[in-house]
Amino acid sequence: MKLCAVIIASLLVCAAVASSSDNQKEFAQEKEMTREETQSLGEHEKDDEVTGSEERSCIEEWKTCENDCECCGMSTLCAASWVDGHQIKLCRNEGGKLKKVLHFIQKSVSKIKSCKK
C-alpha cells in the first residue's frame, strides 16, 4: 500500500514539473520584448557595433565561459573550478529538474526498502 502511494506521488510530481516547464516557456514567449521596447536600446546598439552582423552562438559543454548566459541548454551552468591556483570557468550540464526528481524518487524507494527490513 505504501509503495502504491509513493508511486502515485512520484507520478504527480513528474506531471507537475512537466506542466510548470511548459507554462514557463509560454510565459517567456508572451513576455519576450523586442529591442525597440527595451529601455537599454543604446546598450544593444553598442553590442551590435562590436559584434557586427554575425550571429551569436552559445558555448558548448566543457568549454570556457564567463557567465551562465553564454552556455548552451537550460540546465547548463558556467561553473568555476580551480586548477594549479588558477580559476577556470567551464560550461557544465547540471542535469536540470528531471534529474533531481528522479534522484529524489530513487532515495525515497531505497528508504522505504530499508524500513521494511
Swiss-Prot record:
Region called Disordered, residue ranges: 18-55
Annotated tissue distribution: Expressed by the venom gland.
Organism encoding this protein: Cyriopagopus hainanus
Name of the protein in its database record: Hainantoxin-XV.2
One annotated GO molecular function: toxin activity
Assigned protein family: Belongs to the neurotoxin 03 (Tx2) family. 02 subfamily. HNTX-XV sub-subfamily.
Disulfide bonds, paired cysteine numbers: C58-C72, C65-C78, C69-C115, C71-C91
Signal peptide positions (record): 1-20
